[in-house]
Amino acid sequence: MATETQIRIGVMGCADIARKVSRAIHLAPNATISGVASRSLEKAKAFATANNYPESTKIHGSYESLLEDPEIDALYVPLPTSLHVEWAIKAAEKGKHILLEKPVAMNVTEFDKIVDACEANGVQIMDGTMWVHNPRTALLKEFLSDSERFGQLKTVQSCFSFAGDEDFLKNDIRVKPGLDGLGALGDAGWYAIRATLLANNFELPKTVTAFPGAVLNEAGVILSCGASLSWEDGRTATIYCSFLANLTMEITAIGTKGTLRVHDFIIPYKETEASFTTSTKAWFNDLVTAWVSPPSEHTVKTELPQEACMVREFARLVGEIKNNGAKPDGYWPSISRKTQLVVDAVKESVDKNYQQISLSGR
């Protein structure tokens, strides 16, 4: 049973990622699971049991039933991307706050409809990008904004890849055009794009151009691709995402005075700590045989895993709205929209034989 200070969350769908977020809800001090829904009552029951849901959790055999539950404040929605626009809008119309898995939609037009519904009904929306809630990320932003240690940003490289096995490449929803049809771009690319935007203080690039050589499956879903991003003042970024390459998740940001590197930015090597390296005004010794000042490593200890930090922040925002009459925080849908815009631009460039795509006015 929820306490007065806990936000009551319903889980809409029993996707694999929902196991991780269910644990995060258990760990977050200001949230609890109050309901779960699947299109099969038996599946919802089995999922609740397997994930140690509270005995008081209501089990729903349809998404509609979960939406009608008056004892649910907010929904976590891990449905396939193609279903987001339908169910997120329905959730908003029922006054439910929404923690929406990424990518948030198949395109920005769909996401704008979701945001319009949220704004019309006064509900909070946040996407499920977990790493931005890790305490490490605040320190990354602090270094990037330090004019003495980092200077002015010149370029960012970000990548996320993993090697899907034969079963994944044949059967996972992320390779199915009718489910998560954005493929590696929407899944892995979302993270790499978010990292480049974060480093650029969420200023959208002027142009986006996909690199030739994107790999698509027989159904036309992207399995691997890369792109370059360019800003008006000469800043650049490159992103790479793939279901066909070794597990890698890196950010390198280079400024006029400093360099930032993160080797595990999406999922830390260890759940309870996260590291990054920085260097400032690096140079060689007189004989150019070694560095005078090699990069320094910084480690951040975490009380909660980053996904629980995400739930805690989401629940805090919902609590402010529910209990204190606060307005929804527009920062979260705004950065979701910018990420989706760049995802859309990369896909458009791939579809148009790697043409340069302008983001002016979007």
Curated annotation (Swiss-Prot):
The keyword Oxidoreductase applies. One of its GO terms (molecular function) is oxidoreductase activity. InterPro entries: Gfo/Idh/MocA-like_OxRdtase_N, GFO_IDH_MocA-like_dom, NAD(P)-bd_dom_sf. Its EC number is 1.-.-.-. Keywords: Acetylation, Oxidoreductase. GO terms for cellular component: cytosol. The modification N-acetylalanine is found at A2. Pfam families: GFO_IDH_MocA, GFO_IDH_MocA_C3. Homodimer. Belongs to the Gfo/Idh/MocA family. PANTHER family: GFO_IDH_MOCA-LIKE OXIDOREDUCTASE N-TERMINAL DOMAIN-CONTAINING PROTEIN (PTHR46368:SF19), PTHR46368. This is Uncharacterized oxidoreductase At4g09670. It comes from Arabidopsis thaliana.
